């Protein structure tokens, strides 16, 4: 006997229900790269993403899942042996740290409570202790999908600045993109 459990629907990180109009739009045939409309659609994506992130800065689209974007950011920004800091906020921060280790990066973690956002004071103190400025990057998960914890990006940016630390702030915003009021603090 087959049990029907109601309407099937796609869940994206969050999970978030996808409206029917979006699902219907996904039923359109894929444009070929040589299609004259492809450039218009692509440019629309770039321009519209600027609105989402409230920026005039350059937008880069990367076709992969979040883990693919992690790997791309790690191998294109850092070199083997570089030191990075990954504050622990849940499964995704730990997975990103594990990937970085596999790519031969030196990973420092800032222990955290999976039920709370990053301890901003602890982050700032950790960076202040890096007097030789060896930490090349600070990797943050904006929203941990499983726990729903959302980290305060403006406060994190302020902590890095207050510590007078040059480490590059890299943010995984897969589960939060489009939900934050503004991303201007990342400039």
Role assignments for model-derived ranges:
Residues 118-177:
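Active-site phosphate-binding strand-loop segment of PLP-dependent enzymes
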């Amino acid at each position: 006997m087959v049990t029907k459990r109601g309407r099937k629907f796609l869940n994206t990180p969050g999970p978030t229900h996808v409206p029917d109009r979006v699902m219907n739009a996904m039923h359109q045939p894929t444009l070929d790269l040589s299609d004259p409309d492809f450039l218009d659609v692509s440019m629309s994506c770039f321009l519209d993403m600027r609105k989402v992130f409230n920026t005039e800065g350059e937008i880069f689209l990367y076709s992969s899942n979040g883990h693919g974007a992690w790997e791309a950011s790690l191998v294109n920004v850092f070199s083997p042996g570089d030191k990075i800091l990954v504050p622990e906020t849940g499964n995704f921060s730990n997975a990103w740290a594990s990937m970085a280790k596999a790519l031969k990066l030196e990973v420092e973690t800032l222990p955290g409570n999976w039920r709370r956002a990053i301890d901003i004071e602890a982050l700032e103190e950790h960076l202040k202790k890096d007097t030789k400025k060896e930490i090349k990057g600070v990797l943050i998960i904006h929203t941990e999908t499983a726990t729903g914890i959302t980290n305060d990006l403006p406060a994190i940016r302020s902590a890095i600045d207050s510590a007078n630390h040059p480490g590059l702030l890299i943010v995984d915003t897969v589960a939060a993109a489009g939900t934050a009021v503004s991303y201007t603090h990342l400039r």
